[in-house]
């Protein structure tokens, strides 16, 4: 039983590292995606106010999946083996493999934080709906914390699903927070 708990925690930690790598993409791209959307909406309003046709969006696709991650200094496309959480950063000594520009230590920090939180959640609650719910909440909060630090924004794309997921988890008794307390917290926080 004890070995199983540690195995769940170790697997959770590794999965957390992988999620942390994806969260780095979310933290970097989601605010930029929001800014692009705001600019497009503003251009449409301005065109409408001037009686013109709204401008066509000619910018290349930019979302959480496209384009592939690149070095901001030289444009080198990050290969799969350069994107292994924490290990690639250590192997590359914190530098781009192409131009040797320094990579922020924040990337492995996000990965390690997410891995540690998933490890804790899986150790505390095991591979149960409760453990998985807390892993999801932890991942969302890591993304929100870093986005807030960078931009002072808390994107609705994360906060609103988090609110509903919290209420659902409470209703299904996956947390020890009573549903009434969750609803009151959601009402007060929103």
Which stretches of residues belong to each language-model region?
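Transmembrane helix-loop-helix
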Residues: 123-130
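Membrane-proximal soluble regions of multi-pass membrane proteins
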Residues: 28-106
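C-terminal ends of transmembrane helices
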Residues: 24-29, 93-98, 141-153
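Conserved Radical SAM active-site core
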Residues: 115
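Intrinsically disordered, low-complexity, positively charged segments
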Residues: 19-22, 26, 41
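Hydrophobic alpha-helical transmembrane segments
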Residues: 1-22, 118-123, 166-174
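Functional transmembrane core segments of multi-pass inner-membrane proteins
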Residues: 12, 130-190
